[in-house]
C-alpha cells in the first residue's frame, strides 16, 4: 500500500516529541509529486546507524532516453553519473536539519574514479524505472523525536534534490551523452582486445600516476603516456574515432627499468584497467581484459585444501600439496595458491610485480641449482612454468622486474620504462641474454590443478544463529570476530565492494553451499545470478542495502578462499 505524502506529514506531527522508537511507525511508502518515497529501515536511536530510505521514479517520469541505457555498460555509467549528481545536491543540505547524534545526516554513495555497479542507484533495463537508495539521520533532541526537522529533510530538501538531479529534463543532456559515448567506447576497446589477441591497451596521452598514495585522482602535470612505435595500435572507436595507444600482446610481457622510472605505476594502471574509469581520470582509455588477476606473496594467509602441486611438491613435513592446508602460509606457498586460485576463477592474465613476490617462487638461478640439488628443492619456480601456461593454456603474464634478468629468456615482449616512457627493448634484451645461461622450462605431467573442492555450509551462518559480521574499511571482514584479511587484494577499488563481499559470503553460505557442488560450480552459478539480477540478489525482505558496489567474481573467490572458517 502506498500512502500519500500528507499521510506521512500528519504521522510525523502526531509522533513529535515522543520517544525515538515511535519513528518506526513511519516505515512504508508515500507518494510525492513525481516519485514514491519509501522508509525502509528506521534507526533505533539518533546515535545508531542512519535510517535507510529509497526513492522510486517511474521511467516515463524520469524521462531518460533508452539510448542512454541501451547496454549494461551504458546503464551502469548512467547510474554512476546520477549518483554523483545527486550526491552533490544533497551535500548542500547535509546536517542542515539539527539535533543530537546523526540527526540531519543525508548521505549516499560517493563513487571514486572507477565506474562500478552500485545499489545506491539502479535503473530497470526494460522501462527505465529509477531507484535511489540513501541514508538519513532522523532528527531528535536527545532521544526525543524532532519531527519538524525531519519534515524539512523529506518535504523541503529532498524534493529539490530529486527534481534537479534525477529528471532528464533538468540535466545537462550533452554531459549524459558524453557519459554514454565513453561507456560505449570503453566496451568497444575491451572487445577489441580479444579480437586483436591483446591483453591490454594503454592510450597515448593517458596519465597513469596518481595524485598521492591516498588519492586515486590523476597527478597534476603527470607525463602523458606514449606507446613505442613497435607496439602502437590504432582503434577506430564508435564515438571518439581513431585512438592510438600501446597494445600489449598475449603471451609473456616483461616490464623492466630503473627504480622510480614507472614500472609499478604502469602495472598498477593495468591491474585497475579491469574497470572502466570516468572521463578526466587519465586512465579512461587504459583497458585490461576483465579477468586479469594481480598475484603476490601473502605471508600468513589461510589456504584451505588448494592443489598447489603444479608448483610445490615433496615438502619435508610430508604435507600433501595436492590438497594443501595452512593457517599460516609462507610467501612461496601463498603465492602458489594465489596463482592456482586465480586460474580456478577462469583468469587468462596474471599480473606480477617482483617487489611483492616471493623470490624463491619466481626464480632459482644456476648457482643455487648447483649448490642445492634439484631433488632437494620442493618448489618449481614460476619461471619454469610460465611458458607452458602461455603456450598450452593460453594464460598470459605481465611481470615487473628490476633486479633479475632471468625472465629475459622466456619473455615474448620486453618493455623498459625510461623516465616514465616505455621503450620496446625485446630484440636488444634477447641478444644480451644469449650470453647468460637460461633456465629450462618444465611441463607438468598432468593438469594444472584439481579444482574439485566441495564446500560444506557453515552452521554459523544459519538464520537461527546469531552471526556477527562487520566490515573493517578496505582491510577485512570480521565473521564472529574471525578476520578475513583482504589487504592483499589490490584490485578491490572501493569500500562498498567490501560491503558487497560480506553480503555475498552470507548469500553463498546460506543458499549455495550444499556439500555436493564444488566451489567452481557454485561460483559459476553465482556469476550467472549476478550477471542476470545484479546486486538485487542481496535484497532482504524486498530491501537492498544502499552501500554496495559490485565486486568481480575473482574477488568473491578470493574472499571465500581467505575465510578461515571455510569448511571443505
Language-model segment annotations:
Residues 1-188, 193-197, 208, 568:
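N-terminal accessory targeting/assembly segments
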Residues 167-223, 293-296, 300, 318-324, ...:
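Long, charge-dense accessory insertions within large macromolecular proteins
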Residues 209-244, 279, 287-292, 296-303, ...:
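N-terminal pre-Walker A segment at the start of P-loop NTPase domains
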Residues 243-275:
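Glycine-rich phosphate-binding P-loop
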Residues 310-332, 364-379:
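Flexible beta-alpha connector loops of hexameric P-loop NTPases
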Residues 330-342:
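Conserved alpha-helical scaffold flanking the Walker A/P-loop in AAA+ ATPase domains
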Residues 342-386, 390-391, 403-409, 413-430:
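Conserved P-loop NTPase nucleotide-binding/switch module
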Residues 391-394, 400-568:
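Conserved NTP phosphate-binding and transfer environment spanning the P-loop NTPase/kinase superfamily
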Amino acid at each position: 500500500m502506498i500512502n500519500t505524502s500528507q499521510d506521512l506529514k500528519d504521522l510525523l506531527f502526531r509522533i513529535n516529541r515522543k520517544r525515538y522508537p515511535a519513528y518506526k511507525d513511519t516505515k512504508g511508502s508515500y507518494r510525492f509529486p513525481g516519485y514514491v518515497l519509501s522508509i525502509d529501515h528506521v534507526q533505533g536511536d539518533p546515535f545508531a546507524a542512519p535510517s535507510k530510505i529509497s526513492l522510486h521514479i517511474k521511467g516515463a517520469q524520469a524521462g531518460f532516453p533508452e539510448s542512454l541505457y541501451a547496454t549494461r555498460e551504458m546503464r551502469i555509467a548512467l547510474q554512476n553519473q546520477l549518483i554523483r549528481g545527486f550526491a552533490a545536491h544533497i551535500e548542500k543540505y547535509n546536517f542542515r536539519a539539527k539535533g543530537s547524534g546523526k540527526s540531519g545526516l543525508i548521505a549516499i554513495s560517493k563513487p571514486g574514479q572507477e565506474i562500478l555497479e552500485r545499489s545506491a542507484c539502479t535503473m530497470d533495463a526494460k522501462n527505465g524505472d529509477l531507484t535511489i537508495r540513501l541514508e538519513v539521520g532522523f532528527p531528535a533532541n536527545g532521544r526525543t523525536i524532532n519531527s519538524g526537522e525531519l519534515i524539512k529533510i523529506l518535504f523541503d530538501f529532498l524534493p529539490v534534490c530529486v527534481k534537479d538531479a534525477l529528471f532528464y529534463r533538468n540535466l545537462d543532456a550533452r554531459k549524459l551523452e558524453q557519459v554514454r559515448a565513453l561507456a560505449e567506447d570503453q566496451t568497444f576497446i575491451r572487445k577489441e582486445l580479444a579480437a586483436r589477441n591483446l591483453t591490454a591497451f594503454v592510450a597515448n596521452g593517458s596519465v597513469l600516476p596518481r595524485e598521492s598514495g591516498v588519492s586515486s585522482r590523476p597527478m597534476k602535470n603527470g607525463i602523458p603516456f606514449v606507446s613505442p612505435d613497435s607496439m602502437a595500435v590504432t582503434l577506430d572507436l564508435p564515438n571518439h574515432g581513431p585512438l592510438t595507444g600501446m597494445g600489449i600482446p598475449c603471451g609473456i610481457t616483461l616490464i623492466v627499468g630503473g627504480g622510480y622510472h614507472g614500472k609499478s605505476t604502469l602495472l598498477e594502471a593495468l591491474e585497475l584497467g579491469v574497470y572502466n574509469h570516468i572521463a578526466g581520470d587519465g586512465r579512461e582509455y587504459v583497458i585490461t581484459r576483465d579477468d586479469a588477476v594481480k598475484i603476490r606473496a601473502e605471508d600468513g594467509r589461510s589456504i584451505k585444501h588448494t592443489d598447489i602441486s603444479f608448483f610445490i611438491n615433496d615438502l619435508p613435513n610430508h604435507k600433501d600439496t595436492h590438497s594443501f592446508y595452512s593457517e599460516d602460509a609462507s610467501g612461496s606457498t601463498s603465492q602458489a595458491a594465489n596463482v592456482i586460485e586465480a586460474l580456478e576463477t577462469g583468469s587468462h592474465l596474471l599480473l606480477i610485480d617482483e617487489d611483492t613476490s616471493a623470490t624463491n617462487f619466481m626464480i632459482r638461478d644456476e648457482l643455487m641449482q648447483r649448490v642445492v640439488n634439484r631433488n632437494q628443492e620442493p618448489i618449481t619456480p614460476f619461471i619454469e612454468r610460465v611458458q607452458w601456461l602461455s603456450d598450452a593454456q593460453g594464460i598470459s603474464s605481465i611481470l615487473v622486474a628490476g633486479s633479475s634478468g632471468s625472465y629475459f629468456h622466456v619473455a615474448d615482449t620486453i618493455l623498459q620504462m625510461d623516465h616514465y616512457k616505455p621503450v620496446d627493448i625485446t630484440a636488444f634484451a634477447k641478444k644480451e641474454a644469449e650470453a647468460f645461461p637460461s633456465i629450462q622450462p618444465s611441463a607438468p605431467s598432468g593438469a594444472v590443478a584439481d579444482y574439485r573442492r566441495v564446500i560444506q555450509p557453515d552452521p554459523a551462518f544459519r538464520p537461527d544463529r546469531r552471526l556477527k559480521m562487520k566490515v573493517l574499511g578496505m582491510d577485512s571482514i570480521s565473521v564472529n570476530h574471525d578476520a578475513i584479511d583482504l589487504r592483499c587484494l589490490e584490485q578491490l577499488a572501493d569500500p562498498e565492494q567490501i560491503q558487497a563481499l560480506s553480503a555475498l559470503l552470507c548469500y553463498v553460505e546460506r543458499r549455495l553451499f550444499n556439500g555436493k557442488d564444488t566451489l567452481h560450480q557454485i561460483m559459476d552459478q553465482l556469476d550467472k545470478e549476478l550477471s542476470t539480477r545484479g546486486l538485487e540478489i542481496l535484497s532482504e525482505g524486498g530491501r537492498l542495502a544502499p552501500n554496495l558496489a559490485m565486486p568481480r567474481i575473482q574477488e568473491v573467490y578470493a574472499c571465500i578462499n581467505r575465510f578461515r572458517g571455510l569448511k571443505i
